[in-house]
Amino acid sequence: MTKVTRDEVRSFLIGTLLGDCYASPTYQWQWSNTEQNYVEWKASFIRRYLGASCQVLESKDSTCANGFMYRFALCSNKGRLRIYRNWFYAKDGKKHITKRIRHFDHPLGLAVLILDQGSCRGGLTKDYKTGNTYYRKPTVRIHLNAYPEEELVLFQQALKTNFDLTTTLQKKRSGKSDGLIDVYFGTTETQKLWTLIKPWVPDLVFARKKFHPLIIQTTNAKYVQRQRGCALD
């Protein structure tokens, strides 16, 4: 069995809790079928390194016209699992970012949280008026929209203290997302973030799709240079 540190396990659980995990008397995850391998990877990590009962199940969502299948993992909420749940769940049964976020200090947890709740944008963009192809440097957002702004500030402080990552809070101003707040990494901070988490991102199709703009950024940048007749590095 590969050894992992306590920091890795703790940050993995915190990243999962703040992400897509709903924790009641049992831990529970639910994702679409395209993320089945990711669910299984999480379940395997919990079984291996926490010794908790955890299984991957499958169910059909009858509300979807295309008969989408959903897979989710359940594991008994005992020992450390219960402790970490209590860190971030209030008596009202809702998740909150608390001062315990200071323990979110390993890149594995950050990678998991972005896989759960993040998005990565950037890459080649064509201007159809001029026909020119432009390269937009990748940026990352974490969509922690369920948390109030004052709790997101605590999260920002933890990122700065533990990872030396500087972020901004950006409010959305359109449609159904109006007023929701994203944690935003600018282009420079996104590169620092990627250098930090890349060794900890699982080798899964889902993860490669999530971080695609970062994975192929060198290829894209060189393509634009060739189009413009620039010298390549």
Locate the predicted segments by residue.
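Internal intein/HINT superfamily modules and their associated LAGLIDADG
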Residues: 1-233
